[in-house]
Amino acid sequence: ETITKASRADYRHKKQSGGAGQFGEVHLIIEPYEEGMPKPDTYKFGGQEFKMNVKDTQEIPLEWGGKLVVCNCIVGGAIDARFIPAIVKGLMDRIEQGPLTGSYARDVRVCIYDGKMHPVDSNEISFRLAGRNAFAQAFKEANPKILEPVYDVEVLVPSERMGDVMSDLQGRRAI
């Protein structure tokens, strides 16, 4: 799976059950990633402009190919730096099981630009879940597509079966 356009999402994870609760809010923008892209600068969504001030960038190579690129664009301490790794874990949870079909996702840049935390109720699990759900929400709105596997094969058949085999291969979109 991958995406074909930029998208924005906010997600608030809030759980209260007596005692210390869970709270984490993440605001992010995702876009298709290509090697050599310039740093993100400004995004426009629904008439709103979002300026990015990239503090840190992580390029995470994925085992199945492609990359996840995470840009920390948070200003003013809206989210403590100690919660960024938890957000990245949440992103990886969804990359490993893409939001569309559960297949691996790849080649996505994520800019975390805002959020909220609570002095008592914020913890790593809250931000992991907030990051995971914000990513899933943004992914579904970013015109996702399923990547088809491509194989290079050589087929040897007797000449009397050539027509049947060619017909079958063309039915499977072979070239």
Protein language model features and the residues they cover:
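Accessory interaction regions appended to the cores of large information-processing enzymes
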Residues: 1-175
